[in-house]
Design a protein with these regions (language model features):
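N-terminal alpha/beta PP-like core and its mobile active-site loop of ThDP/TPP-dependent enzymes
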Residues: 1-163
C-alpha cells in the first residue's frame, strides 16, 4: 500500500468523505489516492484558498472534520487564510500539504532553497494551528495521523498537518 493510500483510508475510516484541494506536483500522489478510493470524493477548487475555505464551511455546516490539501511552496502558503479561519472559529479541519523529496531539503543557513518551492510551512502555520508537523519519516505517519485526528477533534480543535 502506498503511504498516500494509507492517509486517505485512515481519514475515510474516521468519517472524512470529502476532500477539498488544488492539484500540484508535490501533492499528486495524495490526489491519485483520493481519486481511486470509492468511498470519498475530491472537490477541486480554482485556488488553494478556496479549498481551505470550502473545508472550513464543510466542517461548520456538517459539524464534522473537514480536509483540504495543497501542493508545496506557494500552494501551501495559499491555504493560510483558511487555516486561520478554522483556528479562530475552532473548526475541526485537517490541512495536508505536499513537500519536497527529503533529499532536496537544504538545511544550509543562508541558502533560501535547494528543492522545488521549498518553504518552511510548519513555521508559517504554527501561529494559527493547534498542531503543525512535517512528517519526513514514513514510519511516523501512523502516530502523526492519530495525533492529528485527536487534536483536530478535541474541544478546542484545529489542526494543520504538513505531510
Amino acid at each position: 500500500m502506498k503511504l498516500t493510500d494509507y492517509v486517505v483510508e485512515f481519514l475515510q475510516k474516521k468519517g472524512i468523505r470529502d476532500f477539498f484541494g488544488y492539484q500540484g506536483t508535490m501533492i499528486a500522489h495524495l490526489v491519485d489516492s483520493i481519486e481511486k478510493n470509492p468511498h470519498v470524493r475530491s472537490h477541486s477548487s480554482y485556488h488553494e484558498q478556496g479549498a481551505a475555505f470550502a473545508a472550513c464551511g464543510y466542517a461548520q455546516a456538517k459539524g464534522a472534520c473537514g480536509c483540504a490539501y495543497a501542493t508545496s511552496g506557494p500552494g501551501a502558503a495559499n491555504l493560510l487564510s483558511g487555516v486561520a479561519d478554522a483556528y479562530f472559529d475552532s473548526l475541526p479541519v485537517i490541512f495536508i500539504t505536499g513537500q519536497l523529496n527529503t533529499y532536496e531539503y537544504s538545511g544550509i543557513a543562508g541558502l533560501r532553497q535547494q528543492g522545488f518551492q521549498e518553504i518552511d510551512m510548519v513555521s508559517m502555520a504554527k501561529p494559527v494551528t493547534k498542531y503543525a508537523i512535517q512528517v519526513r519519516d514514513p514510519k511516523n505517519i501512523v502516530r502523526e495521523l492519530n495525533l492529528a485526528w485527536q487534536i483536530a477533534n478535541t474541544k478546542a480543535r484545529f489542526l494543520s498537518t504538513c505531510l
